[in-house]
Structures are given as structure tokens and as C-alpha cells.
Design a protein with these regions (language model features):
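A contiguous, surface-oriented mixed alpha/beta subdomain in the mid-to-C-terminal portion of proteins
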Residues: 177, 181-248
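Assembly/oligomerization interface modules of large self-assembling protein complexes
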Residues: 35-109
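Sequence/fold signature of self-assembling virion shell proteins
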Residues: 2-5, 12, 216-335
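Short, aliphatic-rich beta-strand segments
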Residues: 113-114, 206
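Alpha-helical scaffold segments that mediate packing/assembly in large oligomeric complexes
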Residues: 115-194, 334
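N-terminal alpha-helical "arm" segments
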Residues: 1-44
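Broad gene-expression machinery/nucleic-acid interaction feature
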Residues: 108-112, 200, 311
């Protein structure tokens, strides 16, 4: 609900009824109000986040298991699946393969918000709209953190950290992008013509890394690229792609920031000795690794227990989970 735009007259009337002195009228209006909020909140939670469409949403029926099959070929064993020269006699060798699976646990996430009934009676849609934004932000923040914690854990489990040994510590360089591309290719399995082979498509960096890009001189980029950096909009990366890799900036990445602290303090990871910041690279060329099973879509309900306190409130919950089926799609770097 945008707080700088007046909603429809029907919405204003429903908001007034939700604060009616008749508790039965208020309860019915609050129930209808909750359902009216459910769809826009659900859209906001699924779209307005920094997961950037990384995870594929998979709706799962209630009561069913969230099992996902893994690739028949395990990482590091690609070379064992070969053909043989047939000498013309004897039996053809047998090679049995059996796929494994992983079960991703789902869990419930909840949030709530309440405000004075007086705001409803006076149709203060700006205050109510802000309250709904706070509720949406609670869900979004939870999903952002859980999704990125899963990605970082997959990167740490891979036990590969790429860094540019020739660059100054704390300075983002083009060579780091190139090195991460090469390491991703070398460690993705298969050969040059393998189908679905991993490659670096997206890189997530801190705002300070983009500041380094803005300060690249003529010894780093040509004059045309310098012009593009100079005229780039302030709400995005100064260069959106380097060597075909999409650049994304996250406030949560950077020295002393939330996700880097999670990487070092909770996961026990560490950047290169002379480096300061973490970089996350992903392969999003295929949707075969990052999954978000959803067992129960976001639902919003009114809270009738708050009427005695002369307040109106709403709460919501959803059941979902996050998983990385193949950690070869994640690579970490530092600068």
C-alpha cells in the first residue's frame, strides 16, 4: 500500500469500518481487510527482495516431502563415465548409476503489526499503509537473510576462495572477475563441450567495490567506458557487466557488514590475509540448483484479541525453505 497515494473510496470505507464501535461490524471489516491485504503483501514479499530471482520458487502440496533429486554424476567423478574400445569378443563392461536425493526442510516464518483503532476510524490510510510496509519488510528481511545464508554456506562448503594476488588489498579489480570466471570453469566438471557446464554469470559485491569501479582510470578502462561510468545512474552499477558477468551491489556485503560477518563469525570463513571484502559469484545460466520450496503461501489474518486494548492488528505466516542442490554453482572471492 503506497503511503503517498490515496487509495480507493471502497478501501477507505473498509478501513473506517474496521474501527467501528460495533465489534461485530469491526471484526467482519477487519477480516475482509486482512484478505484484501494478503495478495499485495504476498506479491511484495516474493518480488521486493535482494534475492534477485536467484531461487526458483517450487510450490509443494501440504503433507508431501520436499525431496529433490541430485545429478546422477557426482562432482569429481565425471572422468569415470567413459566408453571403451571393444576388441570384438567378451562382454561389454557394465556401469550402474543411481541418483541420490536431498530433503530440504521447510519452516514457518511469521510477522505481525498493530495500530490504534482511532487511525482506522479516522481513515488514516497513510499510517495504516506504513504499518503494512513494516509487516512486509519483516517477511522480506527474513527471506533475504535465510536465502543468502544458504548461498554463503554452500560457498564455504565448496572450500574455494579466489583472489587477485597482484591487486592492492581492498581494491576491486577486473582481474578478480576474470580469475573467478576461470576458476568456476575449471572446477565445474566436464570438458569444453559439456552440456550445462557451470560458468560465472552474476557477481555480488559491496557498494565500495562499485566505488572502486567509478575510480578506474585510463590505465584500467578505455575512454568510452570511462564515459559510461561517468554518466551511469546513481541507483545501479556504474558498469552493469564485466567480461559478460552481471554486477550487483548489496549493502549487506562489505567490511563489517551483515553477510560478511555471517561468513566469518558463523561459518568460520575468512578472506585472503591481505584482503578486506567478500565477493559472491553465482552461475544462474540454468535453474537446477537454487530452490525455494513453498508449502504454504503467505496468509494474513486479523487479530481479534487486540480490541480490548483499542487496537487493530494483523498477523501472517508462510512455510518455506531454501536449498542449494549443487554447490558448484557458487564461488567465493575476496579483494
Amino acid at each position: 500500500m503506497p503511503i503517498n497515494k490515496r487509495p480507493s473510496d471502497e478501501f477507505i470505507a473498509l478501513l473506517r469500518k474496521s474501527g467501528d464501535a460495533d465489534i461485530n461490524v469491526a471484526a467482519a471489516a477487519q477480516r475482509e481487510f486482512a484478505k484484501a491485504l494478503e495478495l499485495p503483501l504476498r506479491k511484495g514479499v516474493l518480488v521486493g527482495n535482494i534475492l534477485g530471482n536467484i531461487f526458483e520458487t517450487i510450490n509443494v502440496e501440504a503433507g508431501s516431502t520436499t525431496e529433490f533429486p541430485l545429478d546422477l554424476v557426482s562432482p569429481g567423478l565425471e572422468g569415470e563415465h567413459v566408453a571403451y574400445t571393444n576388441p570384438g569378443h567378451g562382454r561389454i563392461p557394465e556401469r550402474s548409476v543411481e541418483g541420490d536425493y536431498v530433503m530440504i526442510p521447510t519452516y514457518s516464518i511469521t510477522s505481525s503489526v498493530d495500530y490504534l483503532l482511532r487511525y482506522a476510524r479516522e481513515a488514516r490510510w497513510d499510517i495504516v499503509g506504513r504499518a503494512m510496509q513494516v509487516m512486509e519488510a519483516g517477511f522480506t528481511k527474513k527471506m533475504n537473510d535465510d536465502g543468502w545464508h544458504t548461498l554463503l554456506a554452500a560457498g564455504v562448503d565448496r572450500n574455494i576462495l579466489v583472489y587477485d594476488a597482484d591487486a592492492t588489498g581492498g581494491l576491486f579489480s577486473k582481474r578478480l572477475v576474470s580469475l573467478m570466471q576461470t576458476v568456476m570453469r575449471r572446477n565445474s566438471g566436464g570438458n569444453s563441450a559439456s552440456v550445462g557446464r557451470g560458468r560465472l554469470t552474476d557477481m555480488y559485491v559491496s557498494p565500495e567495490a562499485l566505488e572502486d569501479v567509478r575510480n578506474w582510470g585510463l590505465d584500467q578502462v578505455d575512454e568510452v567506458t570511462r564515459r559510461e561510468i561517468y554518466t551511469a545512474a546513481g541507483d545501479g552499477a556504474p558498469i552493469t557487466r564485466i567480461f559478460g558477468v552481471n554486477l550487483h551491489d548489496l549493502d549487506e556485503l562489505g567490511e563489517g557488514q551483515q553477510y560478511q560477518d555471517f561468513f566469518t563469525n558463523d561459518l568460520g570463513g575468512a578472506v585472503q590475509a591481505s584482503d578486506l571484502e567478500l565477493v559472491v559469484g553465482l552461475d544462474q545460466s540454468t535453474s537446477d540448483s537454487f530452490v525455494m520450496p513453498v508449502k504454504e503461501q503467505l496468509q494474513v489474518f486479523e487479530d481479534p484479541a487486540l480490541h480490548r486494548q483499542q487496537r487493530a492488528g494483523y498477523y501472517g505466516f508462510a512455510e518455506l525453505g531454501f536449498g542449494v542442490l549443487d554447490n558448484r554453482r557458487v564461488i567465493l572471492g575476496s579483494f
